[in-house]
Swiss-Prot record:
Source species of the chain: Erwinia amylovora (Fire blight bacteria)
UniProt entry keywords in alphabetical sequence: Cell outer membrane, Cell wall, Coiled coil, Lipoprotein, Membrane, Palmitate, Peptidoglycan-anchor, Repeat, Secreted, Signal
Family: Belongs to the Lpp family.
Protein name: Major outer membrane lipoprotein Lpp
Gene name, Swiss-Prot/TrEMBL: lpp
GO molecular function: lipid binding; peptidoglycan binding
Length: 78
């Protein structure tokens, strides 16, 4: 009975140690993946910021062009 408990305890302890070693490698890999994803998120955030300013400039240009067209249309109607 005691020997069975000792063997069972040794098997559980060995399994835990082996699982712990593989988990460290997986944790390191996941940590690297998270860092990579964080860098990509930062890059995408910068890209979105740049695109927002480009979109605003395009909207402003379109508004000016529409205003010029409206002014020309009013001058033809007179």
């Amino acid at each position: 009975m005691n020997r069975t408990k000792l063997v069972l305890g040794a098997v559980i302890l060995g399994s835990t140690l082996l699982a712990g070693c593989s988990s460290n490698a997986k944790i390191d890999q996941l940590s690297t993946d998270v860092q990579t994803l964080n860098a990509k998120v930062d890059q995408l955030s910068n890209d979105v910021t740049a695109i927002r300013s480009d979109v605003q400039a395009a909207k402003d240009d379109a508004a000016r062009a529409n205003q010029r067209l409206d002014n020309q249309a009013h001058s033809y109607r007179k």
